[in-house]
Each structure stands twice: as structure tokens, then as C-alpha cells.
Amino acid sequence: MSSSPAHDSPSSGSPAAMWDERYASSGLVWSAEPNALAASLLGDLPAGRALDVAAGEGRMALWLAGLGWQVTALDFSTVGLTKGRSRAEEHGLQVDWRLADATTADLGESAYDLVLVLYLHLPEPDIRDLLERCAKALAPGGHLLVIGHDKDNLLRGVGGPQDERLLYDTTLISPPADLQVLRLEQVDRPATGGVAVDTLLLATRPQLAPEPA
């Protein structure tokens, strides 16, 4: 997860093995700093329980843990999670590192106050299924944040998958009807070599109405 996506879907071979190899090939593949757009949207939320889906080396998970969140970081790369765990130990942070494939993992129901899906590019129907499960994992009052490369990135952006079938638009990542949309839009952001075009979804599950006295 990064200003350059951590989980642009590899084109062939075992994705988990390919990401293990990529994460093992250098220090940090992605910046140690949190994604700037995500941080700007989440920094004022009260700390609670968070799930970082496709957490990679854990930079968002570590940032949230530093703010007092109880974080579960889920990824299918053993190497990525090991690097995240090492950084957590260095900084005295507590994160639950969970080895699992986002496309099949049980995310629970009403379990989290925040669910992140940053730059995880999957074809349909996998991405729609994932977002449905992420929505179910939200507790009342919880927030879902999804950011990924937009289809327009192929025309006027840099980086990201070059297969349009893996790219986002506002229709593809529109949330289930039981969530309230706070933002659903295309956004441009600075990137190495130019501008990247992303799709952003920020939604919330409404609080339960109080029972009559």
C-alpha cells in the first residue's frame, strides 16, 4: 500500500509467491510513511478497531497503531507481514498480523470501526465480493475507505496496473445500499513522474437508532 500501489495484481504466476519475492528483494518496497490521502481522511477519526486489507509491509497498519487503533493487518505475503512485524517491534507497536488471502478470508461481521482497502486491484466479481464482505465487517458508525487506480489512469496517469479490467471507477466500487457514502469520486494526486488518477470511496455504516424509552 503506497502512493504507488502495493497490491497491483501481478499478471501471472502465484500472486503470493511473486509478492514474497518482491518484498524480499529490497528494504521497504513502499514508503514507511502512510498514504497521504488516506492519512488526511482518517487522522481525525476516534481510535477503535481497524482492519487493513492487503496490508503489504504494514505502513498504514503501523500508522494507525501509532494513533491508538487496535489493528489487524491482513495479507497473503509472509515476507510482507514479517517486515511489518519487525517494524512494529522496533517502534513498540501492537498489530495483529494475519496471513490470509483477501479474496477468501473471513472478515467477520460488525467487527471493525474502520476497514481499509488501498490499491488492491482485483477483477470482477472478486472486487465486488470483497467490498460486500468489507461492508459487513463494519460496526455501526464504522468507516470503509477504498482507494485504487482509476481507469482514466491509463489515459493520463502514471503507475498502476495496465489492464483496464483491474482498474477502478466510481460505479465499480460503489458501496452496498446500507452504507452512507461520504465521498465517491475520482481524484488526482502527485506521483513520481507525473500525476496518478485514483478512485476514492469513503463510506460509513449508520449508527443504530436508539430504542424507544
Named regions from a protein language model:
Residues M1-L45, G48-G56, L145-I173:
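Conserved class I S-adenosyl-L-methionine
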Residues S77-V79:
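Conserved SAM/SAH-binding beta-strand->alpha-helix loop
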Residues E90-A102:
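Conserved SAM-binding strand-loop segment of SAM-dependent methyltransferases
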Residues A105-L114:
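A short acidic, Gly/Pro-enriched loop at the edge of an enzyme's catalytic core
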Residues D113-I127:
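A short SAM/SAH-binding and catalytic strip from SAM-dependent methyltransferases
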Residues R128-P140:
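A short glycine-rich, Lys/Arg-flanked "PGG" loop and its adjoining helix->strand segment in the class I
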